[in-house]
């Protein structure tokens, strides 16, 4: 038999709701009660007037003392929390005793807590371990239980072990100025416009300054084309001169023959 404490709902015409609490840690924990089911361990959803219960209306703080749990109630609401028909000051903690009557929200229309929708009895009990399936599990495991919680994959989901991940550096694709793709591995490479071999960049020195090797001189295609044309002109130019000089020689010979025949 393990020590636990309970909240038994006895008011509002819906009695019989029972909440059993057994903190999982001996250091204690906190249980939230309110209309926000995503923030509280016990959801108090009013059916008559929704505005009577705050998002986090109150908190139960449990601390282990000897063989039993010491439980105190703290109010965080705007409509109030009553213990034995006495309103608890907001932000004030009150230690509960076995048999105390708790009212969350204002009193009922008749002016008594018994007519309230959320009217509970607090009691200290001992529960067998086989009955722990009905115990309310707290969202907060302790006073300092809030904080980052890692997101874990669901059970049975395939997981890749970290040992299979490759430690080799990943390749990087860079688009250079002339529109070609360069694949870089451990050492970055650059490509010249003339189609030569890739030129490697020097490894940075210890002072963090990179020494870049001078790029090869670019070729001036236009200049080389003019040079070729000039050479062609030199080769072709003697041809027409020889053609023109040959008729002149023949003309002189014919003229000399006519002069000789005229004489």
From Swiss-Prot:
The record's subcellular locations are: Nucleus
Give start-end ranges for the coiled-coil region(s): none
Region of interest (Disordered), residue spans: 140-164, 189-225
* Pfam families per record: FHA (PF00498)
Per UniProt, the keywords (alphabetical) are: Nucleus, Phosphoprotein
Q: Which GO terms describe its biological process?
A: G1/S transition of mitotic cell cycle; regulation of gene expression; type B pancreatic cell proliferation
Q: Which InterPro entries match?
A: FHA_dom (IPR000253), SMAD_FHA_dom_sf (IPR008984), TCF19 (IPR042803)
Q: Where is the FHA domain?
A: 31-88
- What's in the GO CC field? nucleus
Which PROSITE patterns does the protein's record reference?
FHA_DOMAIN
Identify the main location: nucleus
Residues carrying Phosphoserine = 78
Q: Other notes on this protein?
A: This sequence is very similar to other orthologs but it lacks the PHD-type zinc finger domain which may be important for the trans-activation function.
This chain's function reads: Potential transcription factor that may play a role in the regulation of genes involved in cell cycle G1/S transition. May bind to regulatory elements of genes, including the promoter of the transcription factor FOXO1.
Recorded protein name is Transcription factor 19-like protein
